[in-house]
Amino acid sequence: WLGKTQHLSVKEQLNLGVRYFDLRVNHVKNDYVIYHSIINGTRFDPILDDIASFIEENPSETLLLDFQHFKNGSDEYVYHTVLEKLKDHLVVQNNDQSELAFVDELRLKDTRGKCIVFFGDDSPFVKEAHIFSRNNDTCTQKGQALDSCYISSYHAMKSKQFIDEALGYYMDKIQTKKEEEGHKGIFVWQCQLTDSKLVFGPYHRERSHEANMNVFIENLPQQDYFSDINVIMRDFL
């Protein structure tokens, strides 16, 4: 329970409308599993099978697969398995734009029935035409196609302080990027609280945050920055 961040399987989340997944893969013995912090979870291959089946059966949908972290050299396996299982359902860059500009200018008509796959730029496979780069946790790198800022001290705050301080800081970061680099790319707004002391676990932290965060999200369409948001990340649907 200390590492668990969702009660529902990926298949169940897909059926409920989730279209972005933060996936972290660890190589353990002769298998590959999803992990969070020091805790290993379910096997990776069945998850990718569910994703492949969903996108095959729902050709109007678009999925974002954000491989935030790899462990024990798992990126090579993930790369080849994604290529094998998703095949014709991958967004591929076919021009000489920067990948930031390419992703930023994509429209839904370009991505229906496809997955956009992101790796950290420390993986050699990020150079491939169907793998796009994600920024580091502090979002200090230039030209990355996806930003998902995470500063651990913010996520250890109490709910109202987090909303007042952290979310504004993350939004300022992406708007500054858009102004300075001319493109925004995909912006994932990490809105979950975490249990930095490993006492109560993620579920307790999210329940203490849920009411405040739900009100905040309900009011987002009235904000002038609303169009800059691509993904709102939460734990425990």
Question: What name fits each language-model region?
Answer:
Residues 1-237:
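Catalytic cores of phosphodiester-bond hydrolases, prominently lipid phosphodiesterases
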